[in-house]
């Protein structure tokens, strides 16, 4: 009788252990799913189409483009203006130096520009879509929070990522591989929606972006009066 009780007890603990393991696996899967979708879920608008219906062009936001001789490369800042301050100016400078095509979506509000943030995998803006269809390489510039001056590099173009990281390190920039939630590996990310289906995304921390501007400020006045001499010092 005691043997049977021991067997039942052992079986009970085995089943309990299996159940606990199963629960842990489910929790981990759910956590990773939520982490992946977190940036999109916090956006006010599901995509650009929804944003456009609820906002006013040239009041809340504007789009600027520049067509260059080197049309094979497009430099973008889809969270420009007051959304991720400094990204428009930095992307424009890269475009000017390399003679690359340029695109930016800028938040123009005095406040609450973060409400105009549409994640890169849902940014279905028609002008950008047309540019991407005729582009072989894309360099997407973004802003990321952080008190240390760091460039996080991601995207599906490993060769281009390696080359950019190498050159940045030569200039004494700290370059790190992007964390999973901003790694830009999705085929739906605008960085990868070009002819080659791959591109590079650079996430520049707040501390790093401030270094490109006078007095280390990212306010609208400082950005609108940006000195390209100051930006050039970091090339």
Where are these regions (language model features)?
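Catalytic cores of processing enzymes, dominated by hydrolases/peptidases
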Residues: 115-137, 143-228
């Amino acid at each position: 009788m005691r043997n049977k009780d021991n067997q039942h007890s052992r079986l009970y603990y085995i089943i309990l252990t299996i159940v606990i393991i199963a629960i842990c696996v489910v929790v981990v899967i759910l956590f990773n799913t939520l982490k992946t979708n977190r940036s999109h879920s916090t956006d006010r608008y599901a995509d650009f189409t929804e944003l456009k219906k609820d906002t006013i062009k040239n009041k809340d936001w504007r789009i600027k483009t520049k067509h260059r001789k080197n049309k094979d490369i497009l430099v973008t800042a889809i969270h420009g203006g007051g959304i991720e301050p400094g990204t428009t100016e930095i992307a424009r400078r890269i475009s000017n130096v390399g003679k690359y095509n340029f695109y930016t979506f800028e938040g123009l509000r005095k406040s609450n520009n973060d409400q105009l943030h549409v994640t890169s995998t849902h940014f279905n803006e028609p002008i950008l879509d047309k540019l991407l269809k005729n582009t072989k390489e894309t360099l997407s510039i973004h802003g990321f929070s952080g008190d240390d001056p760091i460039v996080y590099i991601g995207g599906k173009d490993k060769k281009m990522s390696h080359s950019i990281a190498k050159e940045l390190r030569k200039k004494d920039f700290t370059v790190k591989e992007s964390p999973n939630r901003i790694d830009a590996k999705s085929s739906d990310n605008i960085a990868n929606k070009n002819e080659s289906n791959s591109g590079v995304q650079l996430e520049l921390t707040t501390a790093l972006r401030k270094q490109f501007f006078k007095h280390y400020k990212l306010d609208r006045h400082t950005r609108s009066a940006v000195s390209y001499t100051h930006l050039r010092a970091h090339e």
